[in-house]
Amino acid sequence: MGIVDYLVAAVSFRTLPTTFVAVLVYLAIFISVLITDELPATPKDQRGLNLTQAYSDLRQIAARPHPYNSHANDVVHDFILTRLQDATAGYDYAHVFDDKVSNGSWSSRNNSVYFEGTNILVKVDGHDADKSGALFSAHYDSVSTAPGATDDGMGVATLLQLVEYYVKHRPQRTAVFNINNGEEDWLNGAHAFLEHPWSNLTDTFLNLEGASSGGRPLLFRATATAPVRAFREKYVTHPHGNVLSSDAFARGVVRSGTDYSVYVDGRGMDGADLAFYKGRSRYHTRYDAVQYTDGGVRSLWAMMEAAQGVSGALLSSEAVHGDKGGAPVYFDLFGQALIVFPLSAMITFNIVFLVVGPIMLALLVTFDIVARHRRQEMIGGGYEEQGFFARAWTSFKSFRWVGGFWKHAKFWVALAVTVGLQVLLCVGYLYINPLIAYSSSHIVLLSFLSLAYLSTYLVHNIPSPTDTYGSHLPEQQKQAALFQLYFFTWILLLAATVVGAKLSVGSFYILSLWNAVLFAACAIGSIAGLLSSHTVEGDASYGSRRRIRGVRYDREGEEEGVESETAPTEVTPLIAQPITVVAPGGKEGEEVSGAIGWWFVQFVLSVPAVVILVSQLALLMLAATEQTLADGSPAVTVYGGASLMSVLAILPLAPFACKLHRRVAYVALVVLIASTAYAWLVFPFSERAPLKVFFQQQVDLDANITETRITGHPAYLRQAIAALPSAGGAPLNCTADDAKAGLQTCGWTPPPALEPSVIALDFNVSRSEGQNQARFEIAETDTRACRVYFDQAVTRFQVHGGTEGVQKGFEIPEEGVRELRLWSRTWDRTWVVDVDREGSALTGRVACEWSEYASGSLGVETRTRIPAYEEVLTFLPSWAVASKFADGLVEGYKAFAV
């Protein structure tokens, strides 16, 4: 075998070259995706920003928990205000406003709110004041159980840097900064901002959020294509975003809310959410602190870098203003580029390929068939053969049709087997260890990937027992599988186009690309067939020698590898035809190979691009959903998603599976066994990924009864509670929780030493004669948050001394509400509230909330103590961590009837 033969073998569709290319491509993609999913290093050139100062600001902001209803919140407010006043001093076009005048009322489906804001606003006048400006928003309050390093200390520290930057580099358009308070108590600070005149100066916004514990910030969602363009690599060095998260919000899959919804629904602004999303197990817990943040200072820089780039575009580029561009489709590539286009463009692209693609391929296949037939006639020399029906009957009796049928059916059989096995593996996870994805999602994904590869490889390598006529030659198998895969994606693309057009879903962009590249691969295969020299029995590249028909039908009985001549007949050529029936390469026992070079072009077209997009989407989806299980999200969503991504990552390899080395399958089998065994046997939680449970104490002030309640996943809740001394021996009352679907709440009576201090509530309720109206007078003690629960719906309310009416776009629903929340910017407030009701009777509860505790208030003077929560912090197992159940860690209440 000479050098030329070796070179030919190296580029032929053979086992070793195909396996080498496939393994190399998949490894390169997986490694690249994993590496680029990590935070990049901080650059030396910080482009006018000061990372050191920002990190120092973050440590001040996130020194301790500082919810709206805490004295620590006032400390953070004063720190931020001082920083901004110092940063803007001496610049007459920069204005700071400590907004302690904006009050408002608004409603949602279940409750109404009256809120008194303490936002800190900054306005930097642009050179072109006549043009609409841009709003930049973050909230400085945290939840009561977390210092708020990522939620939302990093966002606030970033805005402080942007203010300093734009004060020194005056923008073209006006920049408005809303560093708001009360977001954690359901977006109250953003609502208060809408009451301020500066909210009318902007037509677009960027909201900075943190729904996790760091990592790379993600373009969570966007209103239209225009604001997404501000995230392109032209402005943002390391863009990161995917339309999947936006679609998840729009469909209600993500059960969360940000100020984004207030700006969109209340003012109709265009804009985007930029938020952290990894490590949700530490979100809203004591681990949302500076020292526990994923990536630390690099995470902070990632948000600063992205926010600076986006803000620069929003304040200068006309492309992100004016024409909205409709619903967007966007995704990043390795954190280096952001691909963005309107959903309408994708729908048009899909329709074109749905119509043109099949027609073009049908024409190419027809031309190929006609060309083959003409060659057969030329080779046959015009001699008569058996008729069509006679040949068909002969083929049927000899079961030759089975081989052809199996060649086209094996893709669908492999797909069915793969889906079936994936379902079984999902069921195994759900029954054996349903929460293992919480801490080991990459192991779970590895098991699904290895199973998908095994099932695809094994089925595609099952031979047909009647395949003695070359119907399973590798080139033909590949081309048949490519066409089956194209048809499969065509069906998916048709469904995706209908759904995408009706529901404005852009996450199907992978199907658009997949169908297009498969069209190209199938077309190249057909064109290669037209250009190649074919024989009656197969492609000349498979090593067959041409025969005239009379000789061909005299071959029966020849053994493979035996060189012979046919007996002479009246149609035998004058020159003898020596024939060796061997595999390509000319030696007995060598494997059958395909055409030189074309398979590689088809592989490069149909595999890498799809696998890249699927791999990135898989990591994003797992990172965003794996730890939502503690919030009550169904586990089938996580495992079903991992399974789907695995199948989509392996399916592009199906046409080439017949030429993959069996040793890769051995490796996949070992990986499957090891990863599945690990995932089914290991405890699902750790100190790195702790199970989140939710704490609240409720105090019945009428009966003087206190109950400690902890809510969590029912499979592990009792095990976590058993570690608490106060729960030892106490009867537990455990019920399904209505507020957090899928979770369970267990309550018990704590000893007197663990009852909260300074829990006092005085109120009076009276009825107006002749009217269906009641007046509540509520006196707070060491709190600024109270609420009223109604057993009967109320249709109107008015807080004395507050603003009249309800915010536009957030009116009380026609059926009324059954809860009224009252938030005061001052302490120990006495509320006077009038409410209208439908019927004559009105009953319910008046309650106040407390959120401060000793260890969370170090350095801040407060009288409130919650020893039961201190017990939870001290004795909860290391694999569990506590978060707040509601706005208040303690709720004290009294009943009323009028």
From Swiss-Prot:
Question: According to the UniProt record, which cysteines are disulfide-bonded?
Answer: none
The active-site annotation reads: 183
- GO MF entry, a single one: metalloexopeptidase activity
Q: Which residues are glycosylated?
A: 50, 103, 110, 200, 704, 733, 764
Q: Which cofactor does it need?
A: Zn(2+)
Q: Which residues bind Zn(2+) 2?
A: 151, 184, 284
* One cellular component (GO) term of this entry: vacuolar membrane
Keywords for this protein: Glycoprotein, Hydrolase, Membrane, Metal-binding, Metalloprotease, Protease, Transmembrane, Transmembrane helix, Vacuole, Zinc
Record-listed E.C. numbers = 3.4.-.-
Its membrane topology, per UniProt?
A: Multi-pass membrane protein
Q: What is its main location?
A: membrane
Q: Briefly, what is this protein's role? A: May be involved in vacuolar sorting and osmoregulation.
Q: Which named protein is this?
A: Vacuolar membrane protease
Please tell me the species this chain comes from.
Schizophyllum commune (strain H4-8 / FGSC 9210) (Split gill fungus)
